[in-house]
Amino acid sequence: MAKVVGIDLGTTNSVIAVMEGGKPTVIPNKEGLRTTPSVVAYTKKQDKLVGQIAKRQAVMNPENTFYSVKRFIGRKKDELGDELKQSSYNVKTDINSNVKLECPALSKDFAPEEISAQVLRKLVEDASTYLGQQVTQAVITVPAYFNDSQRQATKDAGQIAGLDVLRIINEPTAASLSYGLDKKNNETILVFDLGGGTFDVSILEVGDGVFEVLSTSGDTHLGGDDFDRKIVEWLIHEFSHDEGINLGKDRQALQRLTEAAEKAKMELSSLAQTDINLPFITSTDTGPKHLEKNITRAKFEYLCQDLINRCEIPVNNALKDAQLSSGNIDEIVLVGGSTRIPAIQQLVKKMIGKDPNQSVNPDEVVAIGAAVQAGVLAGEVKDILLLDVTPLSLGVETLGGVMTKIIDRNTTVPTKKSEIFSTAVDNQPNVEIHVLQGEREFTKDNKSLGTFRLDGIMPAPRGVPQIEVIFDIDANGILSVKAKDKGTGKEQSITITGASTLPKEEVEKLVKEAEENSELDKHKREQIDLKNQADALCYQSQNQINELKDKISEDEKQNVQKLIDSLKLSIQEDDYEKIKDIQNQLQQVMMNIGKQVYSSTQQDNSKTEDGSVIDTNSKEA
C-alpha cells in the first residue's frame, strides 16, 4: 500500500514523517539528519544544491543561495516588510507585482513556489529511498495564519514537486495531533508556534480522538529570522562605529553576519554570553578587518524586546476569540525552534501562569502531526476527528469600498455560507464580485483574493435583482466562490487560486519541466556525489601514505601521489569518466598497500625475540 507522508515545510528547516507500525516516525534525510535546511542554491556551473550542502556554500555564493523563501510564498512585493532587508539574494517583481527571486547563475527568475518545490522534492526522494517505495502523496503543513494565496501557493509547490497534496493542515493543529494522540481526558491546550518566519497561536479542545480548534491568531511577519536580524543590525552598527565601514552593503559579509547571528542566538538559549568572531570580514587599503564582539543574553533580549512584546498580541487575541481566560488553559505546547529562547518561554509562563509542556520536540512535532493526519487519510489511523478553523474573515466588496463579511474568522471548516446582494444602479447588466480576506472595514486594507463577473442580469430597477453569493471553504482552507442570479438562474463561479501565485498553466508547465528534468537532476546529483567521494578518497589516501611512509617503497609512494594528483585534476575538470577510472585504480592500489602492510605486520609479530620464526603449523609430539 502506498505511503502518505506528512511534511513540515518550514522557513528555516523542513521535516518529513510517516506512520510506521501505527506510530509516527521522522524520516532521516540522505545525510542522516532528521531536519533538512530549507535552502536551495545554484552554482556557477549551474549545479543545483538542496539542503545542508546548499547551506554550507551560502557564504561563497550569496546571490544564488535561496533561504527563508517561505516568507515570500503567495505574496506580492507590497505585502512584504522587513523580509527584504535580510536577503542576500535579489527579490524582484513581475508585471503583476508577484515576487520573483533572481538567480544570476542561471540568468533566470524563480517564483518562491519553485524553490519550495525543490526542497519538497529532496524530502520526498530521500523518503522514497528510506521507505523502499515511491512517495507520491502528502499532507503539507502551513502556518495557521496563512491567507488563501499562501495556502494555494504551498499546494502549487507540492504539485511542482510531483506530489498529490491530499491536505493542507495548519501547523499548530498538526502539533496538537502529535501532542494529543494518546490523550483520553479532555484538555484545553494553547499551541504557541514561533518558527523561523511566522508566528501562530491556536487554542484547541483535545481529548479522546477529537481535536477541535477554538481559535487561532498570528503574525506572518514574525519569526526567528527577525531575531537574527536584530543581532545583524547591531553588528553592522557596531562595526560601522568602530571601523567606519557599512557591512550591510556587502552581500558576502551580510551572509556571514546572518549565519553568525543565528549561531549566537542559539548559543544564548543555554549560555549567559557568547563571542562572535568573524576574521577577514572585509578589507581596506590598510589591510584585512576582523569582527570580534561579545554579546550577552541580556543584550540580546534588549535588542529583541519589541519582537518579544509582539508575541503577546496573538496570544491575547486567541484567548479573546475563544472566550477563555488564561486560567482555562490546561497545557501550553511550544512549537518551532525559536521557542527555545528563554525570554519567549518566560513570556508564555507570565501570560498563562504555568510552565510550558516540554514533552514534545519543537522541531519535529509539526511533521509528526502531519504524518498522523496522513495516516487518517490513508486509513491507517482510526477514530480521529479534526475540526479546524479559517484564520481570517472572508467577504466581498460592496458599495463605498466596504468589505462585507460572509464567513467570520475562526469558523470551523469545511463550511459553506451565502448572502443575497443586489445591483447599485438601474438596469445594471452585470455585477463584479471582488473577493476579500481580512479583518479591516475597507476593501483597500484587506487582501484581495480575486475578482469575477456575473453577466446577463435582466434589466430592473436597482435593488430588485437578487444575486446570491456563496462562499465554500474546503478542508484545506481553500476557497471557492459562486454568484447566482436568482431571477434567471445564471451563475458564475471561481476557485480562488491566489492573486499572487502562479497561473494554472505555469504550474502545469513547471510540473512537466520537473518531470523531464528529474533524470537530469538525479544524474547531476550522482556526479556531485562521485566528486565528493573522489575528493574524500584523495584526502584519505594522502593521510595513509604519510602515516605509512616507513612501511612502503618509494615507488609505491610516487605511484599513489601520481594517482592522487590525476584524480584531483579530473575533479577540477569535471571529467566524470576519468574520475571513475582513476578512483577505481587508486582504491585498488590502496587496498593492495593495506594488505601488504597488514601481512608484514603479522610476520613481524610472529617472530620470536631472538629473531627466529615460530612454525605455527608444528605440533608437539
Curated annotation (Swiss-Prot):
Q: What is its main location?
A: plastid
Gene Ontology molecular function, alphabetical: ATP binding; ATP-dependent protein folding chaperone; unfolded protein binding
Where is the protein situated, by its record's location annotation?
Plastid, Chloroplast
Membrane-spanning regions, if any? Answer: none
Residue ranges for the region (Disordered) are 597-621
Segment forming the signal sequence? none
Q: Which CDD domains match?
A: ASKHA_NBD_HSP70_DnaK-like (cd10234)
* Gene Ontology CC: chloroplast
Keywords assigned: ATP-binding, Chaperone, Chloroplast, Nucleotide-binding, Plastid
Q: Function, please? A: Acts as a chaperone.
Task: Give the family, as the similarity comment puts it.
Answer: Belongs to the heat shock protein 70 family.
Task: Quote the PANTHER family the UniProt record gives.
Answer: HEAT SHOCK PROTEIN 70KDA
HAMAP family recorded? DnaK
The entry's protein name is Chaperone protein dnaK
Source organism: Gracilaria tenuistipitata var. liui
Q: Which gene encodes it?
A: dnaK
